[in-house]
Amino acid sequence: MAIDLRFVLAMLKINSNLERLGDFAEGIARFAINCKEPVLDGELLQKLRLEEMISQVLSMLELAKKALQEESQEMATAVFAKDNLLDEINANGTAVLADYIGKHSESALSCLNLVSVFRKLERSGDHITDRKNVV
């Protein structure tokens, strides 16, 4: 009976984290819809490692899901390394964007909004690792 209760409580926690991930995804989608720049600078996006960050978040989510399904502590532990990479990319992104704004002041608003996207991706990683702790 105690195991069943722990499982139910764990699922409630996971559900809460998944709801937050949905909120972050909605915020990122709103940025994409409302972005005033027709195309963001490709060189900037490469320096920011945005695609790598997005891929890491998706990979973390998939790995956490598999860890839960297979009750694998090893898989769950691997999620932490990916979160550390997200933290690194996020920290570097702020400096890159500050430098870019200094050189391209006309893109300041889009860049500031992009900081929010990075923060949402980084927080997504935090919520996924929190989900992992339940495994």
Protein language model annotation of sequence segments:
Residues 1-135:
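Cytosolic, long alpha-helical scaffolding segments
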